[in-house]
């Protein structure tokens, strides 16, 4: 618990101290955000607002986890886990793609950064590296960092091993690429209003922290009763998830309306990659759809809008993603953000209820 608190404090301090320093640096370099002309007219005043805030979020999570790991090593000789390294790799690699995209935008002073093809190739390379390493390299706990299948909670309901190991690896790589692409784009679409992505991510990663902590408390081979989980190094995953939540909380101090800085793709792609990796590492890929319900809602509104327009040349929403629709309906930006936070909180509470209900059922406690 002390290690967890240390990680949280370090992450909070890094964001609270580092963000204003980054704001000054970005102002000095004139690296302001470009605002799309076809968006809500109220957003045009945001042109020139410093971006690249995701750099601080990434460092806060990394340093928070590192300080926690250092404390555990000095106290008990516990070395950092492979599972934690892989999850952080997913976050930092996607964050790197986002940084390249952000940097290209501010240099060109337009809303066109990394090409769609370039971003896809980068995501494919990093997601494939993550998938292969997670599946093939053993961890100190004896459990794999990932399992060759698709899980709702812990146990896979579809196993990729049905046609041999080689096919399982290929299918798993495809599955991981889908998850990484889906979640990075979903979080990226959510990052369209001041504080929306930071606040909803704070709530979502808190949920992941609770799930990972429960899995660590009921780890297979442990002394606690009830159903146990064959998850690799869930305590490390808890620290990372909670550090992410706290980093978003600290960043929100400067990102709330009116925002002094935006996280940019550096932050949104990193958080999306981290969300995907945590769902894989905790074996909750499908539960994550509920846990990150707001991200799903934002992404699906965009998919529906584009698909329906291509078929009928009409629009379902006034503008997509859906948070812009409500702005054009007359809601203030702050009202949209706070209400969407509330929606994400409901999704997280629902996911935690499902998770706990599953544990109670598997433990045989439902009718005892």
UniProtKB/Swiss-Prot annotation:
Predominant place of localization: membrane
Catalytic activity, per the record?
UDP-N-acetyl-alpha-D-muramoyl-L-alanyl-gamma-D-glutamyl-meso-2,6-diaminopimeloyl-D-alanyl-D-alanine + di-trans,octa-cis-undecaprenyl phosphate = di-trans,octa-cis-undecaprenyl diphospho-N-acetyl-alpha-D-muramoyl-L-alanyl-D-glutamyl-meso-2,6-diaminopimeloyl-D-alanyl-D-alanine + UMP
Pathway assignment reads: Cell wall biogenesis; peptidoglycan biosynthesis
EC annotation from Swiss-Prot or TrEMBL? 2.7.8.13
Listed under GO cellular component are: plasma membrane
**Looking at its record, which EC class is this enzyme?**
transferase
Q: Which InterPro entries match?
A: Glycosyl_transferase_4, PNAcMuramoyl-5peptid_Trfase, PNAcMuramoyl-5peptid_Trfase_CS
Question: What's a BP term from Gene Ontology annotated to this protein?
Answer: peptidoglycan biosynthetic process
List the transmembrane segments.
Answer: 2-22, 51-71, 80-100, 117-137, 167-187, 193-213, 234-254, 271-291, 340-360
Write out the annotated subcellular location. Cell membrane
Q: Entry's Pfam families?
A: Glycos_transf_4 (PF00953)
Name the family.
Belongs to the glycosyltransferase 4 family. MraY subfamily.
PANTHER family tied to this protein: PHOSPHO-N-ACETYLMURAMOYL-PENTAPEPTIDE-TRANSFERASE, PHOSPHO-N-ACETYLMURAMOYL-PENTAPEPTIDE-TRANSFERASE HOMOLOG
Instruction: Identify the HAMAP family for this entry.
Output: MraY
Its name, as the record gives it, is Phospho-N-acetylmuramoyl-pentapeptide-transferase
Q: What organism is listed for this UniProt entry?
A: Bifidobacterium longum (strain NCC 2705)
Q: Which gene encodes it?
A: mraY
């Amino acid at each position: 618990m002390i290690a967890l608190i240390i990680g949280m404090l370090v992450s909070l301090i890094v964001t609270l101290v580092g963000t204003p320093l980054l704001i000054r640096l970005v102002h000095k370099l004139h690296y302001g955000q470009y605002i799309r002309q076809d968006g809500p007219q109220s957003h045009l005043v945001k042109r020139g607002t410093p971006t690249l805030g995701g750099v601080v979020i990434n460092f806060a999570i990394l340093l928070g986890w590192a300080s926690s790991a250092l404390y555990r090593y000095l106290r008990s000789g516990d070395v950092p886990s492979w599972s934690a390294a892989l999850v952080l790799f997913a976050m930092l690699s996607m964050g790197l793609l986002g940084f390249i995209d952000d940097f290209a935008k501010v240099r060109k002073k337009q809303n066109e950064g990394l090409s769609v093809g370039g971003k896809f190739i980068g995501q494919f390379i990093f997601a494939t590296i993550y998938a292969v390493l997670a599946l093939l390299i053993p961890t100190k706990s004896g459990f794999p960092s990932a399992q060759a299948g698709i899980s709702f909670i812990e146990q896979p309901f579809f196993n990729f091993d049905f046609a041999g190991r080689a096919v399982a690896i290929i299918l798993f790589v495809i599955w991981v690429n889908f998850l990484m692409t889906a979640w990075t784009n979903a979080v990226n679409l959510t990052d369209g209003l001041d504080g929306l992505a930071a606040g909803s991510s704070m709530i979502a990663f808190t949920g992941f922290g609770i799930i990972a902590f429960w899995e660590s408390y009921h780890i297979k081979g442990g002394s606690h009763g009830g159903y146990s989980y064959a998850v690799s190094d869930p305590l490390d995953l808890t620290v990372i998830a909670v550090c992410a939540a706290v980093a978003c909380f600290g960043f929100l101090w400067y990102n709330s309306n009116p925002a002094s800085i935006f996280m940019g793709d550096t932050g949104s792609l990193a958080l999306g990659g981290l969300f995907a990796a945590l769902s894989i590492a905790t074996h909750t890929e499908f539960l994550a759809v509920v846990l990150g319900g707001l991200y799903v809602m934002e992404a699906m509104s965009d998919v529906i809008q584009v698909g329906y327009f291509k078929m009928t040349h009409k629009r379902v929403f006034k503008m997509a993603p859906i948070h812009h629709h409500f702005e054009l309906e007359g809601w203030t930006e702050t009202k949209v953000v706070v209400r969407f936070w509330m929606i994400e909180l409901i999704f997280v509470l629902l996911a935690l209820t499902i998770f706990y209900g599953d544990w109670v059922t598997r433990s045989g406690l439902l009718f005892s």
